[in-house]
Amino acid sequence: MSDAAPSLSNLFYDPTYNPGQSTINYTSIYGNGSTITFDELQGLVNSTVTQAIMFGVRCGAAALTLIVMWMTSRSRKTPIFIINQVSLFLIILHSALYFKYLLSNYSSVTYALTGFPQFISRGDVHVYGATNIIQVLLVASIETSLVFQIKVIFTGDNFKRIGLMLTSISFTLGIATVTMYFVSAVKGMIVTYNDVSATQDKYFNASTILLASSINFMSFVLVVKLILAIRSRRFLGLKQFDSFHILLIMSCQSLLVPSIIFILAYSLKPNQGTDVLTTVATLLAVLSLPLSSMWATAANNASKTNTITSDFTTSTDRFYPGTLSSFQTDSINNDAKSSLRSRLYDLYPRRKETTSDKHSERTFVSETADDIEKNQFYQLPTPTSSKNTRIGPFADASYKEGEVEPVDMYTPDTAADEEARKFWTEDNNNL
């Protein structure tokens, strides 16, 4: 037996030689002369590995979010909690079925190169069909969440007609998206059961485009509506972190980013590995809703109401003007203050005050933690009360009914608060 090393090929000394362009000869359904380069083979392997990584990350992130939600949520029977739980469970189930698909012969390199149908078992086809059906249910849960947010943002709003119209459009678009995904899944299974090598790219592409369109449309509606609402609240001096801010964060994180990713998935070349962007967009849409809700709720628990336009400060257990020493002195400058604020509030149209305007409560942040789950929206405070007894956080413990005569208290901010209350409850058709 000779110990001499085998001679090296002349290509070893050629610096311009690319081994990735070397060909492999194998037998396929087209005969014995089938060839493939090492670069093409490596591309198939990289595509499978990339899909496995993305679905592994998706499964782990969804499972972790599901556990955290069960640990932190205080109310588990609200619609938003149920929708989030269903979406997370479906994304875990879909990822698990996709793992089975990746490990089956259907997704193997052998079948991709040779194309022999006898290499595919009926169990592999069943897993493929179940994966498509779970994907339909996942898209349905995402669309339900989007339509639910559209409904929530217009609940109790003065724009009832516009809100009903936009909710109907969103619902129709969501139904069309889910229907197209269902048609794509059924058509794909029918074709696959007859011929495992057949595909239905037309229906799948149409369903993905509809999903991207629905996300783009509903994100635009939510963001525009919420920006207008928050602008109005800031104009009134409300700086606390409430339901409008929570929904704005949810809409930005869970809708705008997936919209951009969906657009990139169709604008970039598929050979650059952009086919997994659709999976990333779906993951962000499912994860961001509960994560944003929990983060916003935690921020609310530590926040306090703070107003910009208030001229009052608290001293001991009573409520006194913060800058002047008496109500007589305050009344002198009140006309100038209310006049300036009235001109500012006149930037927005007003309507006649209704009876319900007199029963609004002061906004507190202690109940805001469950705001996103109960769909409750707080109102502006009533500056004065027609009753003798004072209530609220500034109630005087030493005050007894009947000790003083009923008087009409007029503070420096009475006129301004009246204008703010009118504006907040108005039916503003110009926004």
Curated annotation (Swiss-Prot):
Per UniProt, what does mutating R233S do? Disrupts the interaction with G-protein complex and reduces cell responsiveness to alpha-factor
Q: What is the effect of changing L236 to H/R?
A: Disrupts the interaction with G-protein complex and reduces cell responsiveness to alpha-factor
Extracellular topological intervals: 1-49, 103-132, 189-205, 267-275
InterPro entries named among the record's database cross-references: GPCR_STE2, STE2_TM1-TM2_sf
Q: GO cellular component terms?
A: G protein-coupled receptor homodimeric complex; plasma membrane
Residues annotated as glycosylated: N25, N32
The chain's Cytoplasmic topological domains, given as residue ranges, are: 73-78, 157-163, 231-241, 300-431
Transmembrane intervals: 50-72, 79-102, 133-156, 164-188, 206-230, 242-266, 276-299
Q: How does it sit in the membrane?
A: Multi-pass membrane protein
One Pfam family of this protein, by short name? STE2
Q: Name one GO biological process term.
A: pheromone-dependent signal transduction involved in conjugation with cellular fusion
Q: Which GO terms describe its molecular function?
A: mating-type alpha-factor pheromone receptor activity; mating-type factor pheromone receptor activity
Subcellular location(s) of the protein: Cell membrane
Q: Locate the region Disordered.
A: 379-406
**Cross-referenced CDD domains:** 7tmD_STE2 (cd14939)
Covalent cross-link Glycyl lysine isopeptide (Lys-Gly) (interchain with G-Cter in ubiquitin) as placed by the record, residue numbers: K337, K374, K400, K422
* Induction comment: Expression is induced by exogenous alpha-factor. Expression is repressed by ITC1, a subunit of the ISW2 chromatin remodeling complex.
PTM annotation (Phosphothreonine): residues? T329, T363, T382, T411, T414
The primary location reported for this protein is: membrane
Q: How is it modified after translation?
A: Undergoes hyperphosphorylation of the C-terminal cytoplasmic domain after binding of the alpha-factor, which leads to internalization by endocytosis. Monoubiquitination at Lys-337 triggers internalization of STE2.
Swiss-Prot/TrEMBL domain comment: The extracellular N-terminal domain and transmembrane domains 1 and 2 mediate homooligomerization. The highly conserved sequence IXXGXXXGA (residues 53-61) is a glycine zipper motif in which shallow grooves in the alpha-helices interact with one another. The transmembrane domain 1 (TMD1) and TMD2 mediate oligomerization by providing a homophilic interaction surface that stabilizes dimers/oligomers.
**UniProt name for this protein:** Pheromone alpha factor receptor
Q: What is the organism of origin for this protein?
A: Saccharomyces cerevisiae (strain ATCC 204508 / S288c) (Baker's yeast)
